[in-house]
């Protein structure tokens, strides 16, 4: 897509390492810190016990979740279990009373009952691997992430993340939960609507600048009456307040319109470069395409015969 990140695993930077498997010691360090601060605890419950709890909850139509059994172990009991080498996970002490409040740039203030947060989720597994929640919070804080922008389906996880930031004594980043991108039927965009992966769009002849331009326009407004922007223009004009609350609809015909505009701007040399894989059967044109996909291939130029 022509998007170049400032830093990363293949580029280096100030906040590495950038691969989570190289950050395990960091996650262990901060999980241990939460225990020392009384914000997390060792859980020695066996898998069989947890399965019995799940079964009871399912049979009685109860909300799923851990029963906080090990939260009440005495320091002596904890030390005894550790000395005996019992396997454990580390769980967060989720606040059980009151509410968690956070501000979202699109949805405003969101109030969440703490009793509705998953009770004391695992932060560090028995094999030393972090769960998503621990890795997410530690990575974002250590890498000085200022804004977390993600789909609205992640809202239920945010109260937990806010509590985790508070447990660490850190200021949480600003949140912006984006509405979903839907298909023409108003349902979440999926394979049944057509191509959804970059590889498929590329194999069908869509230019990177067309994809970037169209996707950037979904659910966001820029200058009135203007449709086409360069990547630099999009970056300079983007504002959080320009984002829409309502879900956007992915219109394949509109994307084809954008693609046609950028194709017509290509020089003869550029057009040759982009059409050659389709003529020779090499490069992107060899990528597998779902034959049942209703999305038609775009017209990349005049038909060839010979």
Can you name each region flagged by the protein language model?
Residues 1-16:
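A glycine-rich helix N-cap at a beta->alpha junction
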Residues 3, 59-60, 243-245:
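Secretory-pathway/luminal and periplasmic proteins that interact with or process carbohydrate-rich
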Residues 11-14, 143, 195:
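Short glycine-enriched loop/turn motifs at secondary-structure junctions
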Residues 18-24:
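Acidic-and-aromatic substrate-binding clefts and catalytic sites of carbohydrate-active enzymes
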Residues 20, 33-177, 182-189, 197, ...:
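Active-site cores that bind ATP or allylic diphosphates and position pyrophosphate for catalysis
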Residues 156, 168-306:
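Catalytic adenosine-cofactor/nucleotide-binding cores of aminoacyl-tRNA synthetases and other
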């Amino acid at each position: 897509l022509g998007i170049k990140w400032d830093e990363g695993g293949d580029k280096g930077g100030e906040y590495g390492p950038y691969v989570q498997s190289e950050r395990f010691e960091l996650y262990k360090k901060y999980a241990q810190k939460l225990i020392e601060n009384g914000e997390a605890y060792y859980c020695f419950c066996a898998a069989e016990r947890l399965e019995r709890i799940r079964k009871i909850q399912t049979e009685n139509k109860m909300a799923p979740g851990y029963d906080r059994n090990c939260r009440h172990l005495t320091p002596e009991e904890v030390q005894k279990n550790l000395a005996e080498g019992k396997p454990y996970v580390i769980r967060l002490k989720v606040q059980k009373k009151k509410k968690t409040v956070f501000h979202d740039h699109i949805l405003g203030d969101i109030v969440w009952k703490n009793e509705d947060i998953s009770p004391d989720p695992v932060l560090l597994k028995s094999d030393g691997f972090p769960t998503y929640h621990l890795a997410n919070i530690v990575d974002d804080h250590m890498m000085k992430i200022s804004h977390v922008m993600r789909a609205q389906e992640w809202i239920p996880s945010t109260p937990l993340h806010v509590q985790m930031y508070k447990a660490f004594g850190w200021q949480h980043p600003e949140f912006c939960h984006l509405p979903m991108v839907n298909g023409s039927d108003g349902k979440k965009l999926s394979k049944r609507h057509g191509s959804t992966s970059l590889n498929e769009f590329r194999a069908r002849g869509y230019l990177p600048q067309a994809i970037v331009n169209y996707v950037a326009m979904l659910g966001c407004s820029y200058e009135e009456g203007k449709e086409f922007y360069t990547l630099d223009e999009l970056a300079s004009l983007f504002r959080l307040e320009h984002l829409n609350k309502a879900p956007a609809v992915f219109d394949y015909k509109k994307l084809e319109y954008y693609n046609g505009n950028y194709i017509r701007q290509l020089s003869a040399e550029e057009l040759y470069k982009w059409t050659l894989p389709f003529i020779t059967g090499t490069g992107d044109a060899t990528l597998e395409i779902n034959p049942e996909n209703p999305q038609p291939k775009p017209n990349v130029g005049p038909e060839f015969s010979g």
